Swiss-Prot record:
Keyword Iron tagged: yes
Leader peptide range in chain numbering: none
Chain ranges of the Fe2OG dioxygenase domain: 205-306
Reaction equation(s) it catalyzes: gibberellin A20 + 2-oxoglutarate + O2 = gibberellin A1 + succinate + CO2
Assigned keywords, A-Z: Dioxygenase, Iron, Metal-binding, Oxidoreductase
Listed name of the protein: Gibberellin 3-beta-dioxygenase 2-3
Recorded GO MF terms: gibberellin 3-beta-dioxygenase activity; metal ion binding
E.C. designation(s): 1.14.11.15
Gene: GA3ox2-3
Length: 369
């Protein structure tokens, strides 16, 4: 289907299907500065992406080791039905297959957090990414998606029903994983309950869903589906199709590790605010999405974080006798720091780090308040 004339000139839209080459607007330098290795090796191999089975009685220990060493892991045995994951992927594929004119009804304008278009972080870069995205809040799912389906017909109702079912499953899973994270920090069951009673981390966590479509690319060596970045919130579940493309950055030596596409598995990424909450014991992970010549790829990011007004600082229980490494910051405040970091090349986490002397005078802030 040809692109309507009025859309071919719209800066918010690029017709990936019609592209026979990668234009300079979408060509990224430095994509091959580091080697790429396969992360599907057997457990124990240095580049094998950790796998955590939530049914394992030692799952908390496995979560802790993966969060400390990688900042990410593959999650299996999570209890989310496979048939639901299949329906979610099919619904996402159908949405991105809509005509351009329909998708553009929901385009994300500058300053908007929800809608259709490029990834939200794309505004920080001069080059465009080889992908389309759609962001919405599960709490406002039906109103957000009315922009895309204003008549609220069958497709709208079906899409909403599938995403609402997925949200219910994922929100319950997030609570279970949060508990595993806290146990991995060394908290007892009673301490986990006390932390939740006092600070209500699980109760108040907010969720955002971001859908991605990475079209096949005529020259994947020049294009990038999603720029390397860390997630800003607590942690993220990534549901990816059976086409690999997610890569994690590893040091010693520097390299990109391709996450294997495992049926039914989800990827969990630790975010920056969780690194702050755990005082650096668990660290966020740089990751990116690459494209290929043969196949489209779909993914869904389910992002968890604190409410906008909540200040996040290291948990007392995470300090283990060490000083606080970060100052208290709200999510919006941290996003402002990240914006400065993107434009200057600095590290956002280093910009909110505090010195030992500062930590000695800042103990009253060492809570999620």
């Amino acid at each position: 289907m040809p692109t309507p004339a009025h859309l071919s000139k719209d800066p918010h839209y690029f017709d990936f299907r019609a592209a026979r080459r990668v234009p300079e607007t979408h060509a990224w330098p430095g994509l091959h500065d580091h080697p790429v290795v396969d992360g599907s090796g057997a457990g124990g191999e240095p580049d094998a992406v950790p796998v955590v089975d939530m049914r394992d009685p030692f799952a908390a220990e496995a979560v802790g080791l993966a969060a400390q060493d990688w900042g990410a892991f593959l999650l299996v045995g999570h209890g989310v039905p496979l048939d639901l994951l299949v329906r979610v992927e099919a619904a996402i594929a159908g949405m991105f297959a809509l005509p351009a004119s329909e998708k553009m009804r929901a385009v994300r304008r500058p300053g908007d957090s929800c809608g259709y278009g490029s990834p939200p972080i794309s505004s920080f870069f001069s080059k465009c990414m080889w992908s389309e995205g759609y962001t919405f809040s599960p709490a406002n799912l039906r109103s957000d998606l009315r922009k895309l389906w204003p008549k609220a017909g069958h497709d709208y109702r079906h899409f909403c029903a599938v995403m609402e079912e997925f949200h219910r499953e994922m929100r319950a899973l997030a609570d279970k994983l949060l508990e595993l994270f806290l146990v991995a920090l060394g908290l007892t069951g009673e301490q986990v309950a006390a932390v939740e009673s006092e600070q209500k981390i699980a109760e108040t966590m907010t969720a955002t869903m971001h859908l991605n479509w990475y079209p096949k690319c005529p020259d994947p060596k020049r294009a990038l589906g999603l720029i390397a970045h860390t997630d800003s919130g607590f942690f993220t579940f990534v549901l990816q199709s059976l086409v690999p493309g997610l890569q994690l950055f590893r040091h010693g030596p520097d390299r990109w590790v391709t996450v294997p596409a495992v049926p039914g598995a989800m990827v969990v990424n630790v975010g920056d605010l969780f690194q702050i909450l755990t005082n650096g014991r668990f660290h966020s992970v740089y990751h990116r999405a690459v494209v290929n010549r043969e196949s489209d790829r779909i993914s869904l990011g389910y992002f968890l974080g604190p409410p906008a007004h909540v200040k996040v600082a290291p948990l007392r229980e995470a300090l283990a006798g060490t000083p606080a490494a970060y100052r208290a910051v709200t999510w919006p405040e941290y996003m402002g720091v990240r914006k400065k970091a993107f434009t200057t090349g600095a590290s956002a986490l280093k910009m909110v780090a505090i010195s030992t002397d500062d930590a000695a005078n800042d103990t009253d802030d060492l809570i999620l308040s």
